[in-house]
Amino acid sequence: MRKTVAFGFVGTVLDYAGRGSQRWSKWRPTLCLCQQESLVIDRLELLHDARSRSLFETLKRDIASVSPETEVVSVEIELHNPWDFEEVYACLHDFARGYEFQPEKEDYLIHITTGTHVAQICWFLLAEARYLPARLIQSSPPRKKEQPRGPGEVTIIDLDLSRYNAIASRFAEERQQTLDFLKSGIATRNPHFNRMIEQIEKVAIKSRAPILLNGPTGAGKSFLARRILELKQARHQFSGAFVEVNCATLRGDTAMSTLFGHVKGAFTGARESREGLLRSANGGMLFLDEIGELGADEQAMLLKAIEEKTFYPFGSDRQVSSDFQLIAGTVRDLRQLVAEGKFREDLYARINLWTFTLPGLRQRQEDIEPNLDYEVERHASLTGDSVRFNTEARRAWLAFATSPQATWRGNFRELSASVTRMATFATSGRITLDVVEDEINRLRYNWQESRPSALTALLGAEAENIDLFDRMQLEHVIAICRQAKSLSAAGRQLFDVSRQGKASVNDADRLRKYLARFGLTWEAVQDQHSSS
């Protein structure tokens, strides 16, 4: 049978009752722990400092009189400040690491009633992390007034038991609410995007380091940056504002002035001093979209502001300070800009700690339907006009939106515009098939203008030498290739009829040879698509 071993602090307040016989009239948690009829403590290891040695000896004698089978062991520790979390945790952590546990022979309990609140928290953390393979035990005084000298009650808390899963499930529910918040409540289905949001959630809560968001225009970089700030504000991590600027709009002296501010007379026309966006973001978040467009001087000053949280306003010889978190957005490959000498390598290294690439809408076809529902609801909240799709109209729009013809070059911004147009033309709050067909034609027209550029990007001037008949067919083939996961999958879709009558098929080889007629390869089509 395993022995029961308990650890605890000598309670300098609760365990102290003087030295006379009157001490037996006071409830003392450590003594009463050893008086429980249903629990026999075989060994009690009491932690105390040198000043509490006398109190420990008194407890040891009293325990021997009420529970002679209990061995009481002195564990002398040195604590300068029992309310200092770092010191107490380090002390108990060292104790746990140095103790020779024998869980196959002994059952361990941690008495958390004595000791400071800091000590109780540290006991809990060490038990939860399994540095101490023990259950928690809490003692309480007797409830009945007619039994003032009774041993009271004890409660054992096993952090491994399923009854405490409810606590863990609360954290899980809260975390899911956080993920939904970052996604604006949209039930996204794309696994890559969902994994990325889970990572962003952890970074947003635990880190204040710069975050770099890559992705095409309209993929939601600015929106996500704002949600990250709101999440931090909800957790009381930030109290400042969200400050946003597109760096592509900053040129010349106005770039310095806009970002870092200026003093009066810094340049022609500077009649008043200006605070600048970095100072406006103090205590909050600064979102620099298209950060790759910043000039060399601005990059150097931004690096100093990130690292030292100080900078010089334009035209000033006095430093100012601003403590903000930076989120940068870009559609360009900053690594390539660094290689070309157009972007500072040290700045890139500083903002590249947390990098996330937001996929475009075309890469998240599973999320088109839930985002459609979100945009419909958003339109209703903005305008007060509730609209709904007819079943046939909804089916037709989704079929086109997820087809190879739908390039969604404007991504979610374009999807939002599409919903706005259909909602505007809705009759009596219903989006009909006629409205959807008009919208599909409008989108087709918009996207047709961009199609030749895909061929031109692949073939250059040679694209002009291809007949219109072949060019239109090739464009459609390329669109399907870009939607397919593999060469074989694209071949099966393209040769879906002719392959039925053949005993053996090699769709991948047929497609490879077709592309080769125009000097193209599967790899070239995919590479150009991923970089576009």
Curated annotation (Swiss-Prot):
The gene is rtcR. It holds the Pfam family Sigma54_activat. ATP binds at residues 215-222, 281-290. It comes from Escherichia coli (strain K12). Keywords: ATP-binding, DNA-binding, Nucleotide-binding, Repressor, Transcription, Transcription regulation, Two-component regulatory system. GO terms for cellular component: protein-DNA complex. Transcriptional repressor of the rtcAB genes. Interacts with sigma-54. This is Transcriptional regulatory protein RtcR. InterPro entries: AAA+_ATPase, P-loop_NTPase, RtcR, Sigma54_dep_tscrpt_act_RtcR, Sigma_54_int, Sigma_54_int_dom_ATP-bd_2.
